[in-house]
C-alpha cells in the first residue's frame, strides 16, 4: 500500500448470502488467505486511547493506523495508514511523548517505548473487489473483506482508499451505496475484531477503552476502530 493513503471503511455483520450477493453485483474474488495479526500497546493502552493502532501482520510487516479528519460522523471510520517503519516510529514517539529514539526499526523501539503484545489472533479472509455501476473507470475499486477470526467472530468491511481529504465524501457515498446493496441496515455498526477480542479476553482493558470512548466527542471512531483494524 502506498504510504499516506487515507482508508475510509465501514464494518458490517456478514450473513450466509453475502458472498453470493457480491457475485450478483459483479464482484470478483481476489483471494482467500489466512494470517496472524499481533497488536502492541503500553500496559495503560496509551496508543488505543489516542485512537492509534499498532499491528504487525505475519509475513507482511508493521502498520500504524492514525485517526483521520474530525467531524466525519456515521457508521464508518476514516484512518491514515502508515507502513514505512521510520514514519511509524516517529509517530509513536510523538503520541507517547518520547524523544531521542531516532527513526529506526519498530521492533527496536518496542522496549524503550514500553510497548508489549496485547492481542494476537488468526484471521481467515476472503477479499473481493468491485466497481459500482455508473462509477468512473478511473475511480479506485471498492474492496470488501469478509473475515472470520479464530475466536469465532465474523465481520465484513467495505473499504475505499483515497489520496486526499477532498475525496472522502465521494468514497463515503460509494461505501454507503454498496452497503445498502448488500442489505446492511443504514445505521448498523459492527466492532472490529480487536475490540471483540479485548471484550472477551481482556475485559478490564475493554472497559478502559469504553470509558475513554464515552468522554469523546466522536465516540463512533473508537467504538468501531479498526481496524481496525483489518
From Swiss-Prot:
Function: Hydrolase highly specific for thiamine triphosphate (ThTP).
CDD domains: ThTPase (cd07758)
A GO term from the CC aspect: cytosol
Species of provenance: Homo sapiens (Human)
EC number of this enzyme: 3.6.1.28
GO molecular function, one term: hydrolase activity
Location(s), subcellular: Cytoplasm
Subunit-level organization: Monomer.
Similarity remark: Belongs to the ThTPase family.
Tissue: Widely expressed but at a low level.
Cofactor (UniProt): Mg(2+)
PROSITE patterns documented for this protein: CYTH
N-acetylalanine, modified sites: 2
UniProt xrefs under Pfam families: CYTH
Gene that encodes the chain: THTPA
Positions annotated to bind substrate: 11, 55, 57, 65, 125, 157, 193
GO BP: any one term: generation of precursor metabolites and energy
PANTHER family: THIAMINE-TRIPHOSPHATASE
This protein's name: Thiamine-triphosphatase
Amino acid at each position: 500500500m502506498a504510504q499516506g493513503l487515507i482508508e475510509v471503511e465501514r464494518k458490517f455483520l456478514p450473513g450466509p448470502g453475502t458472498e453470493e450477493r457480491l457475485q450478483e453485483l459483479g464482484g470478483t474474488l481476489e483471494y482467500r488467505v489466512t494470517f496472524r495479526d499481533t497488536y502492541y500497546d503500553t500496559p495503560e493502552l496509551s496508543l488505543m486511547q489516542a485512537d492509534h493502532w499498532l499491528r504487525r501482520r505475519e509475513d507482511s510487516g508493521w502498520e500504524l493506523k492514525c485517526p483521520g479528519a474530525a467531524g466525519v460522523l456515521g457508521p464508518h471510520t476514516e484512518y491514515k495508514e502508515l507502513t514505512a517503519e521510520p514514519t511509524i516510529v516517529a509517530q509513536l514517539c510523538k503520541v507517547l511523548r518520547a524523544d531521542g529514539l531516532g527513526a529506526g526499526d519498530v521492533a527496536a523501539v518496542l522496549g524503550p517505548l514500553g510497548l508489549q503484545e496485547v492481542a494476537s489472533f488468526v484471521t481467515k479472509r476472503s477479499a473481493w473487489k468491485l466497481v459500482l455501476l455508473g462509477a468512473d473507470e478511473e475511480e479506485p475499486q471498492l474492496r470488501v473483506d469478509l473475515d472470520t477470526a479464530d475466536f469465532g467472530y465474523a465481520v465484513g468491511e467495505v473499504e475505499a482508499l483515497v489520496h486526499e481529504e477532498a475525496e472522502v465524501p465521494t468514497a463515503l457515498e460509494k461505501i454507503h451505496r454498496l452497503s445498502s446493496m448488500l442489505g446492511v441496515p443504514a445505521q448498523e455498526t459492527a466492532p472490529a475484531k480487536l475490540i471483540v477480542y479485548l471484550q472477551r479476553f481482556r475485559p478490564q482493558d475493554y472497559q478502559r477503552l469504553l470509558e475513554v470512548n464515552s468522554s469523546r466527542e466522536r465516540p463512533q471512531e473508537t467504538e468501531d476502530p479498526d481496524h481496525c483494524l483489518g
